[in-house]
């Protein structure tokens, strides 16, 4: 069960940038907390951060065939990037969008997320704890998908066995 965590522009500045909005926690600590959860729950987690839209698109595309799910904070690109939205849609992987702040309670231009339209869910406004919530949700989603695939494979095997006996 592999999850790729993709962090967008300026998130490398957490702990320094606008602490009244984003708090004092650095991105490295958020990632360490996520890794701890992953280790405790049999998950593999990979982290990626970029300030460049094209690099984020490339990373999303690289997830196809390599990851089971994506947790993404597109940051400011949430509101503007059709390219990131289309990349998420193209890979068809369970994707959860995270925002540290409640984007719906901020400036008007931040209230609509293009990328949320293709995400399985959005977690916003819980500070760094939102990433932990995303890990819990992704674990549940991937566990359910795994159980479904297992049940389908079992049903298919039983159907083939039944066809052989006929």
Curated annotation (Swiss-Prot):
Q: What is its EC number?
A: 4.2.1.10
A biological-process GO annotation? amino acid biosynthetic process
Q: Where does substrate bind?
A: 73, 79, 86, 100-101, 110
Instruction: Please give the SUPFAM superfamilies that the UniProt record associates with this protein.
Output: Type II 3-dehydroquinate dehydratase
Q: Where is this site: Transition state stabilizer?
A: 17
Q: State the Gene Ontology terms under molecular function.
A: 3-dehydroquinate dehydratase activity
Pathway per the UniProt entry: Metabolic intermediate biosynthesis; chorismate biosynthesis; chorismate from D-erythrose 4-phosphate and phosphoenolpyruvate: step 3/7
Entries under InterPro entries matching the protein: DHquinase_II, DHquinase_II_CS, DHquinase_II_sf
Task: Quickly give the catalysed reaction.
Answer: 3-dehydroquinate = 3-dehydroshikimate + H2O
Print the keywords alphabetically: Amino-acid biosynthesis, Aromatic amino acid biosynthesis, Lyase
Classify the source by domain of life. Answer: Bacteria
Q: Which residues form the active site?
A: 22, 99
Per the record's keyword annotation, is Isomerase included, yes or no? no
| Protein task | Catalyzes a trans-dehydration via an enolate intermediate.
Please state which protein family the record places this protein in: Belongs to the type-II 3-dehydroquinase family.
Q: Please describe the quaternary structure of this protein.
A: Homododecamer.
Q: What is this protein called?
A: 3-dehydroquinate dehydratase
